[in-house]
Amino acid sequence: XIMVEKDPVKTSFEKWAQPGHFSKALAKGPSTTTWIWNLHADAHDFDSHTNDLEDISRKIFSAHFGQLGIIFIWLSGMYFHGARFSNYEAWLNDPTHVKPSAQVVWPIVGQEILNGDVGGGFQGIQITSGFFQLWRASGITSELQLYCTAIGGLIFAGLMFFAGWFHYHKAAPKLAWFQNVESMLNHHLAGLLGLGSLAWAGHQIHVSLPINQLLDAGVDPKEIPLPHEFILNRELMAQTFPSFAKGLIPFFTLDWSEYSDFLTFRGGLNPVTGGLWLTDTAHHHLAIAVLFLVAGHMYRTXXXXXXXXXXXXXXXXXXXXXXXXXXXXXXXXXXXXXXXXXXXXXXXXXXXXXAHHMYAMPPYPYLATDYATQLSLFTHHMWIGGFLIVGAAAHAAIFMVRDYDPTTQYNNLLDRVIRHRDAIISHLNWVCIFLGFHSFGLYIHNDTMSALGRPQDMFSDTAIQLQPVFAQWVQNTHALAPGSTAPNAAASTSPTWGGSDLVAVGGKVALAPIPLGTADFLVHHIHAFTIHVTVLILLKGVLFARSSRLIPDKANLGFRFPCDGPGRGGTCQVSAWDHVFLGLFWMYNSISVVIFHFSWKMQSDVWGSISEEGVVNHITGGNFAQSSTTINGWLRDFLWAQASQVIQSYGSSLSAYGLLFLGAHFVWAFSLMFLFSGRGYWQELIESIVWAHNKLKVAPVTQPRALSIIQGRAVGVAHY
């Protein structure tokens, strides 16, 4: 069975040159300016171009190659900047004093003021992407190597663009190929994750480890042999790692402990660099490779062994959920939007977890002491997680509107969730109200007691304690666990769990135990509140995407629509798309509090300088536990204390940050105005809550009604 079709679509630059060629309506050209917005909205909405599932699948497949090409170009640009406009070699010689910079502002109208002195005789903008630390970890010792990698990135980008064109225009896979889920799982697990990790582990062992070992010992980067010399010359490697002299003999004689000089299991951080032991990370990636190479043989393909995904899903029938997974496999295989939703949700959870690993287990040398980069990486990965979660909800709603077939989905898990949607939404709504009032109420109580001069009646570590006992138990367990589970390890996975390990590099704290107290308990419940509100908005958008009491035939109106026609007042801003819009606002709210919590907590309890005698002087002097228990403390000791430096930056090389700071707050305040106008959204939520009141026979006589759009805008502009 040949799985590709030859030359299915002509390569035509004339066609591509015509704006809107993908849509009959748009190809006619503009009649109003709305046309240009629709171009942007529909260019990648392949569902709207055609109903042919095979063609849609090919377009998505091809677009993935295009995306990879763009990523390679972007990466190449990063490496090129490191080669052409950076002080990487100076930083490599003295990473504790020189600040990383790979951007020089050209003098056009005076913005060269932004080029500050970053050390190493270099004027530029300090960068906080962590690339320098990553380059050192991968064994790059010169700017020439960065040039070569940048060129390699462009070559790979070209290959990706070619592959995208080839697999749509020259040899396009057939639908059966796209729907062969087991083969896809096997190939991605074994190929991408398994062989990818194996290749990276190989690079780490043969190139990164010897070079970093020499760098840590203080050898001048210019005197370190080039990467290929380590790969080709076994004696050179054996100088650093003696077991290399034995070659592969210990591997085949199963005498693997011989390799423990370069595949370690130490735990904790390297005291020279403040990063994870690179011998630990090489061991880790080798283990991951083995794991995924095995996983890549789990699913049944041409060979008769292993599990078929459909059978695996059907086998999960417990007593309560009898036919629970019936037809779920078919839905995932045939509906791209459902698969995107599940994948985006899983990847988002991973991204948010990764954000925490970047500071708790800093993977690269000298990353932990570069505080600005640590803040940036945490923020960056939290934002990615947030976008992906909202994207998961968006695609789940698109799936509900476009691909959901109620006839095939009877009484399975999906159907049961949808039938319980009123109970789910009204409970979530109650949880949000409870969390919001109680967590904010604790702060307001503290502000009031503080203002009345009654500190003994406040919730804090020195008055009424609300210790996060479960979190402390988890921390303690992780601090002690390696003693029994990994007796040979030198330390637990991270100093943050507790104990007395403080890692300092060059007089700066890299990482120390992070104590949790009443202040963390309070802000944690703000996190719980904002996240639950985000979930409420997004889930409501998904569960009511096809129908609601307000608009029973919503599925016919599509994923995004302004109102249900002119005759139905109060149905505006109620589409699934509008829920994504409102969900994004709350995702931003959630992340703001998370980043505030992280940056203040780290500056107060972890980061700082350390004296010769070993006395730690934290950046904000450990004020988090007492100050952050009141709203006033957050405003005065965090927001104002940290913002005043930015606001007073005009005339220094930091001035751009002051301007961006002002501008970002203006955008934020302006956007609040639009939040209050979701008329139909609120009406739909109210109907669900009224249902819950009717169930319990406590419904009010006066019928609850959402604010009109005019009223909502009045409230919005007043707040603004």
Curated annotation (Swiss-Prot):
Keywords: 4Fe-4S, Chlorophyll, Chloroplast, Chromophore, Electron transport, Iron, Iron-sulfur, Magnesium, Membrane, Metal-binding, Oxidoreductase, Photosynthesis, Photosystem I, Plastid, Thylakoid, Transmembrane, Transmembrane helix, Transport
GO biological process: photosynthesis
Binding-site list for chlorophyll a: M673, Y681
Positions that bind phylloquinone: W682
Reactions the enzyme catalyzes: reduced [plastocyanin] + hnu + oxidized [2Fe-2S]-[ferredoxin] = oxidized [plastocyanin] + reduced [2Fe-2S]-[ferredoxin]
Cofactor note text: P700 is a chlorophyll a/chlorophyll a' dimer, A0 is one or more chlorophyll a, A1 is one or both phylloquinones and FX is a shared 4Fe-4S iron-sulfur center.
Enzyme class: oxidoreductase
A matching Pfam family: PsaA_PsaB
Primary location group: plastid
GO (cellular component) term, any one: chloroplast thylakoid membrane
Compartment(s) of residence: Plastid, Chloroplast thylakoid membrane
TM region positions: 60-83, 146-169, 185-209, 281-299, 336-359, 375-401, 423-445, 521-539, 579-600, 654-676, 714-720
SUPFAM superfamilies in UniProt: Photosystem I subunits PsaA/PsaB
Domain of life the protein comes from: Eukaryota
rRNA-binding as UniProt keyword: no
Disulfide cross-links: none
Sample GO molecular function, one term: oxidoreductase activity
Residues that, per the record, bind chlorophyll a': H665
Protein's membrane topology: Multi-pass membrane protein
EC number: 1.97.1.12
Xref: InterPro entries: PSI_PsaA, PSI_PsaA/B, PSI_PsaA/B_CS, PSI_PsaA/B_sf
Residues that bind [4Fe-4S] cluster: C563, C572
Family of the protein in this entry: Belongs to the PsaA/PsaB family.
Described purpose of this protein according to its UniProt entry: PsaA and PsaB bind P700, the primary electron donor of photosystem I (PSI), as well as the electron acceptors A0, A1 and FX. PSI is a plastocyanin-ferredoxin oxidoreductase, converting photonic excitation into a charge separation, which transfers an electron from the donor P700 chlorophyll pair to the spectroscopically characterized acceptors A0, A1, FX, FA and FB in turn. Oxidized P700 is reduced on the lumenal side of the thylakoid membrane by plastocyanin.
The protein's assembly and partners: The PsaA/B heterodimer binds the P700 chlorophyll special pair and subsequent electron acceptors. PSI consists of a core antenna complex that captures photons, and an electron transfer chain that converts photonic excitation into a charge separation. The eukaryotic PSI reaction center is composed of at least 11 subunits.
Protein name per the record: Photosystem I P700 chlorophyll a apoprotein A1
UniProt organism field: Marsilea botryocarpa
Lineage: Eukaryota, Viridiplantae, Streptophyta, Embryophyta, Tracheophyta
Name of the gene this protein is made from: psaA
